[in-house]
Swiss-Prot record:
This is L-seryl-tRNA(Sec) selenium transferase. Converts seryl-tRNA(Sec) to selenocysteinyl-tRNA(Sec) required for selenoprotein biosynthesis. It catalyses: L-seryl-tRNA(Sec) + selenophosphate + H(+) = L-selenocysteinyl-tRNA(Sec) + phosphate. It comes from Haemophilus ducreyi (strain 35000HP / ATCC 700724). It is found in: Cytoplasm. Its EC number is 2.9.1.1. Belongs to the SelA family. The gene is selA.
Length: 460
């Protein structure tokens, strides 16, 4: 045992070797020492446990293993992946892909000084939300708009500004929870207001709102149940009905759309999603929605509505805490400008482009992917093109599915499939699919930059 342990080199010895010196120059002394200690400890533990040297880890080749480990630890964690899950707006994979115009605008904002809060024509300071507000007003018909860093922040700012220390009435069937345990009741608590639930889970009437109103009521609130749907014996109150009640009793109505859409998705043959423009036209005081979901832009929370209410939001101390930086604003501005030319949206917005692909187009992709994979995989794996059902994702239209095609992979054992999935994850750009029906599904509707995927698979 002692003889085996004696072959383990010291950290100091590794540092003095030429290969060790080169690694220190490349990765730094601290990182090298940490990895060296880890490799040495692992080798020592193996000897103590098995009373032998590991076959795949010779004691005289530790520097090679250290180099491999250092290379892996230095890789950027948020690396590019190919999304073949069938979920287009996959929250865990970054949601919307930016348009080329948005990427260019954001890159320019990073490289140069910009007129972030400067009115060039007037030669004086301006507000960073001004341009975004003007675009949103033109697109939605709202009087004014402001931007924060996500939709949860938009809801928080709205509640903190208008309902702190007071009551907000919401239907019990609209108390949503989204990914990451974000809950409307929790946001209300953080904003310092009291939630008043009305109605039941499946049925809420206008009389329920009316009965709950008192001198402490600050807001009537509608929350779009974007990530679930209640069906069957149901009844809900529309924004228009709430607005009429609010006007009668002198209370504003605010609507959280969650995902939100600026275009009628049905015109592209897609399931309909509530339009921001419709909520504004109904008289709702403020509407909140996300920029990185159906809108197809960077992460941001957008609030549109009455000018006086937007001004109150801008004046609240939380607005500065939650404001967006120049890069996000540049990307969002470029994204919104696409909506001024709605006929070109499917060309410029990657999200909409993916959503509107024809089955014939997907079949061509599926055939190419099947051919590329068949050259790469051994005889254990059987590849087949099958019909699939994709989804939009990020809480948008949770019960709706989009017709799609996928390359499915089966194997003699589940272990073989898991090994293949792991191999896909170890590629230069990991391939992320999904498991179902004892198959690995690679759905073509959700994958962007398809040609690059094929090039990677066919690299020698």
């Amino acid at each position: 045992m002692q003889k085996l342990l004696s072959v383990i080199p010291s950290v100091d010895k590794l540092i003095k070797q030429l290969a060790g010196i080169a690694l220190i120059q490349q990765y730094g002394h601290q990182a090298f020492v940490a990895q060296a200690r880890q490799v040495i400890d692992s080798l020592r533990q193996h000897i103590l446990t098995h009373q032998s040297l590991p076959v795949d880890q010779p004691a005289d080749n530790l520097l090679s293993l250290i180099a491999t480990n250092l290379q892996q630890t230095q890789q950027i964690a948020m690396k590019k992946v190919f999304n073949l899950t069938g979920t287009i707006l996959h929250t865990n994979l970054g949601r919307a892909i930016w348009s080329e115009a948005a990427i260019t605008a954001a890159s320019d904002a990073m490289r140069h000084h910009s007129a972030l809060e400067f009115d060039i024509e007037a030669g004086k300071r301006s507000h960073r939300d001004n341009t975004i507000s003007q675009l949103l007003c033109e697109i939605t018909g709202a009087e004014a708009a402001c931007v924060v860093n996500n939709n949860a922040a938009a809801v928080l700012l709205m509640l903190a500004t208008f309902a702190k220390g007071k009551e907000v009435i919401v239907s019990r069937g609209e108390l949503v929870e989204i990914g990451g345990a974000f809950r409307i009741p929790d946001i209300m608590q953080q904003a310092g207001c009291k939630l008043v639930e009305v109605g039941t889970t499946n049925r809420t009437h206008l009389k329920d709102y009316r009965a709950a109103i008192n001198e402490n009521t600050a807001l009537l609130m509608k929350v779009h149940t974007s990530n679930y749907q209640i069906q069957g014996f149901t009844h809900s109150v529309s924004e228009q009905q709430l607005v009429e009640l609010g006007q009668e009793v002198g209370l504003p109505v605010m609507s959280d759309l969650g995902s939100g859409s600026l275009i009628d998705m049905a015109t592209f043959g897609l399931p309909a999603e509530p339009l921001v423009q419709q909520k504004v036209a109904s008289g709702v005081a403020l509407v909140t929605f996300s920029a990185d979901k159906l809108l197809g832009g960077p992460q941001a929370g957008i609030i549109v509505g009455k000018k006086a209410d937007i001004e109150a939001l801008q004046a609240h101390p939380l607005k500065r805490v939650l404001r967006c930086d120049k890069v996000i604003l540049a990307g969002l501005e470029a994204t919104l400008r696409h909506y001024l030319l709605p006929d070109q949206l499917t060309t410029h917005l990657p999200t909409l482009s993916l959503l509107t692909q024809s089955i014939d187009h997907l079949r061509v992709k599926a055939t190419r992917l099947q051919n590329s994979l068949s050259k790469r995989l051994d005889a254990r794996y059987h590849l087949q093109i099958e019909q699939s059902l994709a989804q939009i994702g990020s809480g948008a239209l949770p019960t709706e599915r989009l017709a799609s095609l996928a390359v499915t992979i089966t194997a003699p054992t589940q272990r073989d499939l898991l090994q293949l999935e792991q191999q896909f994850k170890m590629l230069k750009y990991p391939i992320i699919g999904r498991f179902a029906e004892q198959k690995l599904w690679l759905d073509l509707r959700s994958v962007a930059q398809f040609d690059q995927l094929i090039e990677m698979l066919e690299e020698k």
